[in-house]
A protein has these predicted regions:
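Serine-dependent carboxylesterase/thioesterase catalytic core
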Residues: 35-45, 49, 55-165
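Flexible, membrane-associating and regulatory peripheral segments of lipid-active enzymes
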Residues: 1-34, 57
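Generic preference for hydrophobic/aromatic residues in regular secondary structure cores
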Residues: 12-14, 150, 167
C-alpha cells in the first residue's frame, strides 16, 4: 500500500466524470458511479488500480484524499459530501461509496452527519473494507487526532455507534 503510487503517483489517474453537466430531464445514466475513500496514512493513490478498472467499465468515479492527514475524522465528512455530490451530478444516481480502513469510519461519520431522511437519496450502497468498526488496538499508541479516534472501544467509536442512523 505504501509503495511508489502513494507519495508520487497519487494524481497519475484523474477522477472520471463522463458527464460534467447535469442530466437532462428523463435522461438516465447507464452505470452507477463510485466514491473511493482511502484509509489512515494513505491518499487517493491507494485506489489507482481500482480507478483504471472503473473507467474501463464505464463507471464515473472520484477518489478523495483526506486532508490534513492527521486531522479529525469528523472534519473529513465535507470532502465525502462534495465527492458524492460530484458523482451524483455526473450520473444522475446516488453512488456506491467504498471506504478502506479508516475510510470506512469516515463514511460512517459522513452518514451520521446527514439529515435522517436524506441518506437514501445520497448513497446507493456503502462498502467498507478492513474497517476497524470497533476501533483498533493501535489507536492507543497514536499521537494523531484520527489515530486516537480509532482507539479500540474508544469514546469516538462508541459515540459514532450510538449516533449513526439505523441501517
Amino acid at each position: 500500500v505504501f509503495g511508489w503510487r502513494q507519495p508520487f503517483r497519487h494524481n497519475a489517474v484523474p477522477d472520471w466524470l463522463p458527464s460534467l453537466s447535469p442530466l437532462s430531464p428523463g435522461q438516465q445514466a447507464t452505470r452507477r458511479g463510485v466514491v473511493l475513500v482511502h484509509g489512515f496514512l494513505c491518499n487517493r493513490g491507494f485506489w489507482l488500480p481500482w480507478m483504471a478498472a472503473l473507467r474501463e467499465r464505464g463507471h464515473a468515479h472520484v477518489a478523495v484524499t483526506l486532508e490534513p492527514a492527521f486531522g479529525s475524522i469528523d472534519d473529513y465528512t465535507a470532502t465525502i459530501d462534495a465527492a458524492v455530490q460530484r458523482v451524483q451530478e455526473a450520473t444522475g444516481m446516488a453512488p456506491v461509496v467504498v471506504g478502506h480502513s479508516m475510510g470506512g469510519l469516515v463514511v460512517r461519520a459522513w452518514l451520521r452527519s446527514l439529515p435522517a431522511d436524506s441518506a437514501a437519496a445520497r448513497v446507493h450502497r456503502v462498502i467498507t473494507l478492513g474497517t476497524p468498526h470497533g476501533g483498533t488496538w493501535a489507536g492507543r499508541f497514536s499521537r494523531s487526532v484520527n489515530g486516537q479516534q480509532m482507539a479500540l472501544g474508544g469514546e469516538w467509536v462508541r459515540q459514532l455507534q450510538q449516533e449513526e442512523p439505523a441501517a
